[in-house]
């Protein structure tokens, strides 16, 4: 199948036309309107500094139902100890920049380019991109970030600078998302790490159908706070 070159308008081809590896289109920009259009259609950007902007819609898709979250026994002990304080939206830019700096086995460089950082910081300021942080005292020990639309949360990346810090942030984030009415956490592509937490692969068509239902719900815009469902008023 051909790889589509995107027009200036924030429009995308049908995800069913993606290559077997999930690559759907090339080009365009990372302006908020295009990014939010992409997420609403089950498409996300993933590229490195040496390539043009690439857009993906893999089949199958890794997802997590918040109600199906599995917490390994060893991590349950860490959670009970309260080793980390977990927050939301207290350090979004620090989290995404730390994710960009993280060493990734088998990868040279990072896909979270400066252009990507700027784009997601803009989404954060619009109230649709969010971070969860794990703190050890006053030190940022780990965290993750993603995009929220309707009752769906699209996880993007996570990092840890201390043992289990990102895992604690992940578990607390999924628990909070469930309490806030989120029905679907998009994990994009399979990793054994996320499978251990209950994520599973589903066909792209099923993912898109579930996403469409999730988008019928209102988006939790604004700064999020843990300890309650939804952002502060």
Swiss-Prot record:
Cystine pairs: none
Keywords noted in UniProt: Acyltransferase, Cytoplasm, Transferase
E.C. number: 2.3.2.6
Gene3D superfamilies with a match to the protein in the record: Leucyl/phenylalanyl-tRNA-protein transferase, C-terminal domain, Leucyl/phenylalanyl-tRNA-protein transferase, N-terminal domain
Single Gene Ontology MF annotation: leucyl-tRNA--protein transferase activity
Localization terms from the record: Cytoplasm
Any GO BP annotation: protein catabolic process
Class of this enzyme: transferase
Major subcellular location class: cytoplasm
GO CC annotations on file: cytoplasm
UniProt function note: Functions in the N-end rule pathway of protein degradation where it conjugates Leu, Phe and, less efficiently, Met from aminoacyl-tRNAs to the N-termini of proteins containing an N-terminal arginine or lysine.
HAMAP family: Leu_Phe_trans
Protein name stated in the entry: Leucyl/phenylalanyl-tRNA--protein transferase
């Amino acid at each position: 199948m051909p790889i589509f070159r995107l027009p200036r308008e924030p429009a995308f081809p049908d995800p069913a036309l993606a290559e077997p590896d999930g690559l759907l289109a090339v080009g365009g920009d990372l302006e908020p309107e295009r990014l939010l259009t992409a997420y609403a259609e089950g498409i996300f950007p993933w590229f490195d500094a040496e390539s043009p902007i690439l857009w993906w819609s893999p089949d199958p898709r890794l997802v997590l139902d918040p109600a199906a979250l599995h917490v390994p026994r060893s991590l349950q002990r860490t959670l009970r100890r309260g080793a980390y304080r977990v927050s939301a939206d207290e350090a979004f830019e620090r989290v995404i920049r730390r994710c960009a700096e993280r060493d990734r086995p088998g990868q040279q460089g990072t896909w979270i380019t400066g252009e990507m950082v700027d784009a997601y910081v803009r989404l954060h300021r619009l109230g649709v991109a969010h971070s969860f942080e794990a703190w050890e005292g006053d030190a940022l020990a780990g965290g993750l970030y993603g995009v929220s639309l309707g009752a769906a949360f699209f996880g993007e990346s996570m990092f840890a600078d201390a043992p289990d810090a990102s895992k604690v942030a992940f578990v607390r984030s999924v628990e909070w998302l469930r309490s806030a009415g989120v029905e679907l956490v998009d994990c994009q592509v399979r990793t054994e790490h996320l499978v251990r937490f209950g994520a599973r692969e589903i066909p792209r068509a099923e993912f898109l159908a579930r996403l469409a239902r999730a988008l019928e719900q209102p988006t939790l815009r604004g700064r999020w706070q843990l300890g309650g469902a939804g952002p502060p008023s």
